A protein has these predicted regions:
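Edge beta-strand at a domain terminus
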Residues: 100, 109-122
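A short, polar/proline- and glycine-enriched secondary-structure boundary/capping micro-motif
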Residues: 39-45, 87-90, 114-119
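Short polar/acidic secondary-structure junctions
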Residues: 10-12, 84, 95-97, 108-110
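Short, solvent-exposed aromatic-acidic interface loops
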Residues: 33-38, 82-86, 108-112
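Short, conserved turn/kink motifs that form compact alpha/beta structural patches or helix kinks used as
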Residues: 71, 80-84, 88-90, 94-96
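Short, hydrophobic/aromatic-rich segments at coil-to-beta transitions
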Residues: 1-6, 72-79, 101-104
């Protein structure tokens, strides 16, 4: 899943941001490179927990996806994803689909969660 991905809001179905996923020593992480909504360009993670070093930091440039490891043919799991809008962190699972053109990002707590489809941007 290394590369740039356009995140698609699972409710509005509109492009939300671009997240770049990188791999280092077998661990994958993702940083926000771009936010599409002009009104949110200067967004900060105001809702992040007080003990999270990302609290109050700009969302653009922020690492929101951490700790993913390859867990099978096209599955990456074991990491977490931060939703900067609400400051909550979820268990993350990524499945590469459609020959690498898209990925399914599943964020969950226990068995409750939601899935977004991200589209390759590069």
């Amino acid at each position: 899943p290394v590369g740039a991905w356009t995140t698609i809001d699972d409710e509005s179905k509109k492009p939300k941001s671009v997240v770049r996923i990188v791999e280092r020593n077998g661990v994958y992480s993702g940083m926000v490179e771009k936010i599409f909504d002009p009104a949110k360009q200067d967004s900060k993670c105001d809702e992040c927990a007080s003990d999270d070093p990302r609290k109050g930091q700009p969302v653009i440039g922020m690492t929101i996806l951490t700790g993913l490891k390859h867990n099978g043919e096209s599955v990456y799991a074991g990491g977490s994803i931060l939703d900067p809008a609400n400051g909550k962190t979820y268990n993350a699972k990524v499945t590469v689909i459609e020959g690498g053109k898209k990925l399914e990002m599943r964020g969950s707590v226990l068995f409750i969660g939601r899935t977004q489809t991200w589209v390759r941007a590069d």
